[in-house]
A protein has these predicted regions:
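N-terminal ectodomain recognition module in secreted, GPI-anchored, and membrane glycoproteins
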Residues: 1-2, 7-13, 19-23, 32-37
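Surface-exposed interaction patches
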Residues: 152-154, 163-177
Length: 221
């Protein structure tokens, strides 16, 4: 892990070895590669495994399939099963012979009828602009996405020669009032930080991951 800042923004580079490039979650038997940074929001850090009930942690999570979607287009079920059949409701205007047999690609559908996307769930949004999510947690089973206004972290990942390189970038101190769920990296301060890596080929997902204990990041003045 490496980090640097210019007084306004901070960037963190995470590099790790992985024998396989797992970048799809379309099938239920497939799992992604991913990496996350966890920041303690308390000077006395809570349990490093997702925080504690009275102590929030802020998490930045990069996901390989989101990066692949941005590079090559949203991975949909037709990409995995190209010969699938798509049924449509019969039309009272056209005969069955005249009805076009379209596809069911998510990006071409009305979000109203794609429950998660229509409800504003960022995980279900096929048009998401970044391969990273800003999350918070205060103990096991409490992980949730921060509101859209807080999704200000940028990230970019590259897999080459059995190695991942992922860069996270964000302003040191987000504008607006101080929020208890967002880390503020003030100049001259020290913040507890931990890391997690998911290996899709090992069927890692959710709490099955490789984690570190708390480390310390010092924001040089």
């Amino acid at each position: 892990v490496r980090a640097l800042h210019d007084g306004e923004e901070i960037a963190l580079l995470l590099v790790w070895h992985d024998d396989t490039y797992d970048r799809s979650t379309v099938r239920p038997q497939d799992f992604r590669d991913a990496v996350a940074i966890e920041f303690s929001l308390a000077s006395d850090p809570p349990f490093f495994g997702m925080g504690e009930s009275a102590k929030l942690v802020n998490i930045w999570m990069w996901k390989s399939e989101m990066q692949a979607d941005l590079a090559s287009g949203y991975q949909d079920i037709e990409d995995v099963y190209p010969d699938m059949v798509v049924d449509t409701y019969p039309s009272i205007v056209r005969s069955p012979v005249d009805q076009p047999m379209g596809d069911a690609r998510t990006v071409g559908l009305d979000p109203t009828y794609i429950a998660g996307w229509g409800a504003g769930n960022p995980v279900s949004d096929p048009t998401r602009p970044e391969p990273v999510e800003v999350l918070q947690a205060h103990g096991h089973g409490t992980l949730q996405a921060r509101p859209p206004i807080d999704q200000t972290v940028e990230a970019n990942g590259l897999y080459r020669a059995d190695t991942y390189r992922v860069v996270f970038r964000r302003v040191l101190t987000p504008m607006g009032k101080k929020d208890t769920g967002i880390v503020r990296l003030e100049l001259g301060t020290e913040v507890a930080v931990a890391f997690a890596v998911w290996n899709g080929n090992a069927r890692d997902r959710d709490g099955k991951k490789n984690i570190s204990i708390w480390q310390s990041i010092k924001i040089a003045p």
